Amino acid sequence: MEVRKTRTRWPVRTYSRVVPGASGRVLVVDDNKVIRQLIRVNLELEGLEVVTAADGAECLEVVHRVRPDVITLDVVMPRLDGLRTAAQLRADPRTRDLPLAIVSACTQYEVETGLDVGVDAFLAKPFEPAELVRMVRELMERRTGRQERAHEEEDGEVQYSGERAGGNPVYP
């Protein structure tokens, strides 16, 4: 597999590596460079393309250009923390359906607040690389399933069981 390394014109801290034939793109947002590299390397080894950002503000600057399939967010970061970043991503119609995962200490507060703003998954640090990969793959599969259902609904091809509950069709 040929791998090309590219430099972007985005802020200096952003990292992007083009992986021909990549099975998906992940935007990794963490202020700790070592954690960003750890996540990046493990996801790239699984054939995923990874773009990194050092904080939530940088994430919001690049998300529309990067168009990731999944975003991982640390919680405690300078400028804009992960929970406020998640809330802003959910408020934007262009990013509201992107799968979001918090990769952090995952305190009770972080989990409760994350659920309130629409975070899809949580992974506590320190984590096993296999757990990270499994979580990202599951989020990507869920997103693909959501997109397929949305296209079926647009095309008017939604299948239903024909059973009725209160006069309304029941969808599987």
Segments the model singles out, each with a brief description of its role:
Residues 77:
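Receiver (REC) domain active-site loop signature in two-component systems and cognate sites
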Residues 37-45:
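Charged docking surfaces used in two-component/phosphorelay signaling
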Residues 1-25, 130-172:
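Non-catalytic signal-transmission and effector/linker regions of two-component phosphorelay proteins
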Residues 54-58, 69, 81-87:
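Acidic catalytic/metal-coordinating carboxylates
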Residues 47-54, 62:
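Short hydrophobic/Thr-rich beta-strand motif most characteristic of the beta2 strand and flanking loop
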Residues 66-72:
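Active-site beta3 strand of CheY-like receiver
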Residues 84, 106-123, 130, 134-138:
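Alpha4 helix (beta4-alpha4-beta5 surface) of REC/receiver domains from two-component response regulators
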